[in-house]
Every structure is written in structure tokens, then in C-alpha cells.
């Protein structure tokens, strides 16, 4: 029924965005045809609200999440209590990666079936439209999105390793130039390219390091050695970041003890039918979560680490020349008792292979890397040779 309604709307307005307002009690409804997801959530505990928000982000997957209702009744909680709660609700929702928030409601002047509603007061204003403290609190929260100004943002070094990446690296560097983050540098490691990768990199504000071709892990370590940031973030040369990518990664480092943090890598639209099929095929670069916010694996196209901890473990293992280095690094960090985090809004757009030939070649490389990982980490594999995640 809901899909039929969706189709009717799309017939009338093909460019319009369609959603369905859902509730926690019916979160089991999987509606992948919707353009974005909406939930009404009323929770008075900040910890529980943030935990449930993380759950919802994983339920909705690649689609934007909108908080279509949140609020608190001042009749039972007091006007100051309402103001305090609404401020953290808005901050938590936007800091947790929601695309937007609706606060319920504007005024206490409310009707139902032609009668005044007098047993609750959810409004930001009173019946006479005079503002309650919640109005100023919400205004303050919305004025500082996705995070309050003045946080002690760490310096971040973004490392881009490239081998013959001239076809896509310009998009990567353009995206990095548009980042909304106060303190970062870009380091491009040209791993012996024979195309125009280096010439393109020279057009941008970045540190360019040219080496002979020594493989991906060595290139990552070269960038690590040059990095001046407290955090080192890695993005592939066939990906480009959301403008707030570093902000969400860094915010997670500020609020958790994680050794590393990653986020989703989504296939950009318009890459063609083969790339779209590859994006849906098995064997892609996906994160592996242990909980809604803790990961076992964050893929190399979108990962960031505390530099000091990378230095402690000696960086990336050079034997992994094309793939597998990210998995090995994640396991080595966790073997020391450290954890990896995940933020659903730390998004990069990652081009998939757009031909069967390049996809097949990629999968061969992944297979070789998997065999190397099994030799190094036999306890991580079962009898048939499959990884036992978690």
C-alpha cells in the first residue's frame, strides 16, 4: 500500500521527494523505495536518544534520516526542563548526522476534534504566543550546526595515495578543497604514476610527494611520515568527501577514545549502469560493525586514525601492495585493546568500477589480499577460508 502511494506521488511529481513518517514501534517496516527516512522520536534521556539515533541510522542505511518530531511537554517537565531537553535533542540529532529536525510544536494553542487540548504543553510559545525558554534554546541549537562553535578541533592530515589516478583524482582534490573544517592539510602521494596524476595535484593546495611504485601500504606510510596532524585521514583517489566529512570524523575523536573512525562510502549517482551493478555486488569496500557505533573494520577509502597510535604499531604492513592493508591495520589496532568508531554522516562518495574487466581485476586483487590476510591472521578465518567477523 505504501509503495503504491509512493508511485502515485512520483507520477504526479517525478522530481519530488517522498517519505513516510515512522515511529519506533514500527521501525521493522523496511521501505527502501523512499527517498529519505523520517521518524518521530520522544526520549527524555540523552544517552538513550543518541543510542537509538545510531540504531536508526543503521536501519535506514544509505538514505538521509530526518527527525520529523521531537519535543517535551513543559506542563509536566517545567519550562526550563523543556528548554534544556530540546537543546540537547536538536544538537544530538544534527551531531548524529540527521539531515534535519522538526520540533513539536510551535505553540501550546492546540486543537483536536474541535476542542482545545489543555493537558499538555509542547509548544515553543505559550497560548498567548509569548516565547518560552525553549524557543531561545532551540534557536541557539540550530545556529550551531552540526556542532557548537569553539570546539578544540584537532589538526587533520588528509592523505591521498594514487597510482595512475588522473581520471578521478581531480574530483578528490576539488572535494577536499571544499571541506568545511578549520585546520587540515592535504598530502598527495604519487606512487610512481605514469599518467598526469602529479600534474593535476600541482594545481591544488597540497603537499605532493612523488615516489617510485612501491605499493599502497608504502604510499600510506609515506603520507603518515609527512603528516603534521594529530589525526591522519585516508581517502582514495577515486572518491570525494562530503563537505562535513572531517567535521564528523573529528567530532567522534573528540568524544570517544577510539583509535580510528570511519564512515560510509556511497556510490555517486550518474556513473552508469555497470558501476551501479558493481555497487550492489558482493566484495565491495564495506564497513563491518560490532555495534551501531563501534566497528571491526573501516575501509581504506574512508578511514582516519590517531597518528600517535599508528606510529606505535608501525603504520601499514608493506606486504599489502594493493589491498588488505586496511583490514590488517584494523585488526592490529584491536589486538592491542583499542577500538574503532563509525559515524554515519562522515560520508565519502566512492566511484565503483565501471566495466566488468576492471571489476574482475579488482576482485582478483582482493582475493590475493584475502589469502595473505589468512596466512597472517589464521584465527580470523574458518575452515572454508571465510573471514569470521566479530
Language model feature labels by segment:
Residues 2-94, 125:
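Extracellular glycoside hydrolase catalytic/binding regions
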Residues 105, 340-390:
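Active-site-adjacent helix/loop segment of glycosyltransferases
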Residues 211-227, 289, 293, 301:
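Glycine-rich, basic loop-to-helix element that forms the pyrophosphate-binding segment
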Residues 244-275, 339, 351:
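Conserved donor NDP-sugar-binding/catalytic core segment of glycosyltransferases
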Amino acid at each position: 500500500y505504501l509503495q503504491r502511494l509512493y508511485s502515485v506521488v512520483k507520477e504526479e511529481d517525478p522530481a519530488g521527494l517522498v517519505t513516510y513518517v515512522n515511529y519506533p514501534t514500527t521501525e521493522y517496516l523496511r521501505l527502501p523505495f523512499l527517498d529519505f527516512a523520517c521518524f518521530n522520536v520522544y526520549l527524555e534521556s540523552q544517552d538513550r536518544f543518541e543510542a537509538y539515533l545510531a540504531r536508526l541510522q543503521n536501519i535506514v542505511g544509505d538514505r538521509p534520516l530526518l527527525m520529523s518530531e521531537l519535543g517535551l511537554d513543559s506542563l509536566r517537565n517545567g519550562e526550563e526542563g523543556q528548554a534544556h531537553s530540546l537543546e540537547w535533542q536538536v544538537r544530538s540529532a544534527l551531531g548524529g548526522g540527521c539531515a534535519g529536525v522538526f520540533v513539536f510544536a510551535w505553540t501550546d494553542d492546540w486543537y483536536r476534534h474541535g476542542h482545545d487540548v489543555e493537558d499538555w504543553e509542547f509548544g515553543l510559545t505559550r497560548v498567548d504566543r509569548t516565547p518560552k525558554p525553549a524557543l531561545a534554546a532551540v534557536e541557539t541549537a540550530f545556529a550551531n550546526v552540526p556542532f557548537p562553535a569553539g570546539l578544540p578541533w584537532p589538526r587533520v592530515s588528509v592523505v591521498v595515495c594514487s597510482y595512475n589516478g588522473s581520471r578521478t583524482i581531480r574530483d578528490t582534490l576539488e572535494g577536499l578543497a571544499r571541506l568545511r573544517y578549520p585546520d587540515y592539510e592535504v598530502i598527495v602521494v604519487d606512487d610512481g604514476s605514469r599518467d598526469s596524476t602529479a600534474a593535476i595535484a600541482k594545481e591544488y593546495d597540497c603537499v605532493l610527494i612523488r615516489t617510485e611504485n612501491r605499493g599502497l601500504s608504502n604510499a600510506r606510510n609515506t603520507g603518515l611520515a609527512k603528516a603534521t596532524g594529530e589525526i591522519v585521514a585516508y581517502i582514495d583517489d577515486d572518491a570525494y568527501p562530503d563537505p562535513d566529512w572531517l567535521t564528523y570524523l573529528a567530532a567522534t575523536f573528540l568524544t570517544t577514545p577510539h583509535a580510528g573512525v570511519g564512515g560510509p562510502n556511497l556510490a555517486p549517482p550518474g556513473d552508469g549502469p555497470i558501476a551501479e551493478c558493481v555497487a550492489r555486488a558482493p566484495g565491495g569496500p564495506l564497513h563491518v560493525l560490532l555495534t551501531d557505533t563501534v566497528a571491526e573494520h573501516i575501509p581504506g577509502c574512508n578511514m582516519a586514525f590517531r597518528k600517535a597510535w599508528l606510529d606505535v604499531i608501525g603504520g601499514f604492513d608493506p606486504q599489502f601492495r594493493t589491498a588488505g592493508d586496511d583490514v590488517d591495520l584494523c585488526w592490529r589496532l584491536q589486538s592491542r585493546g583499542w577500538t574503532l568508531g563509525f559515524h554515519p554522516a562522515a560520508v565519502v562518495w566512492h566511484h565503483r568500477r565501471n566495466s566488468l574487466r576492471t571489476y574482475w581485476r579488482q576482485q582478483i586483487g582482493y582475493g590475493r589480499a584475502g589469502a595473505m590476510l589468512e596466512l597472517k591472521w589464521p584465527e580470523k578465518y574458518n575452515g572454508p577460508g571465510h573471514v569470521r567477523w566479530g
